[in-house]
């Protein structure tokens, strides 16, 4: 009986090993996708910046362009933060409503 359980235990260990590896690969893929996206954004930023910078511009002009771009990006970040807060609030409200609906459905089950 002990011999019969050993292959099964080995199968479980192999399954766990494979499952962990699969999860690790998924995390690595997600991490690489974030790095790709971040670097693509950097390339786009540099492309945009090169469109604004013209030969003969002073350093002050270039710094002004960079400051303006930074302000625009900070405004976008603020907008996304506000949007996420609104979505989180809506999600919490929906969770409360769903919980209330679930409690209402459970009341008739208790009486039965």
Swiss-Prot record:
Species for this entry: Proteus mirabilis (strain HI4320)
Protein purpose: Pole-localizer protein involved in the regulation of several cellular processes.
Lineage: superkingdom: Bacteria
Record keyword Chaperone present: no
NCBIfam families in UniProt: PRK05423.1 (NF003844), PTS_reg_TmaR (NF040881)
Keyword Transit peptide: no
The entry's keywords: Coiled coil, Cytoplasm
GO cellular component, one term: cytosol
UniProt family annotation: Belongs to the pole-localizer TmaR family.
InterPro entries tied to this protein: DUF496 (IPR007458), UPF0265 (IPR053375)
Pfam families, per the entry: DUF496
Coiled-coil intervals, chain numbering: 22-42, 70-104
Principal location class: cytoplasm
Official protein name in the record: Pole-localizer protein TmaR
Subcellular location: Cytoplasm
């Amino acid at each position: 009986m002990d011999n019969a359980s050993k292959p099964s235990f080995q199968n479980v260990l192999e399954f766990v090993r494979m499952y962990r590896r699969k999860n690790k690969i998924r995390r690595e893929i997600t991490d690489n996708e974030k790095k790709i996206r971040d670097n693509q954004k950097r390339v786009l930023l540099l492309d945009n910046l090169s469109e604004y910078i013209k030969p003969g511009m002073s350093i002050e002009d270039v710094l002004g362009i960079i400051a303006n771009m930074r302000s625009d990006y900070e405004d976008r970040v603020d907008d996304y933060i506000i949007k996420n807060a609104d979505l989180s609030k809506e999600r919490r409200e929906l969770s409360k409503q769903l919980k209330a609906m679930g409690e209402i459905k459970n009341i008739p089950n208790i009486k039965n």
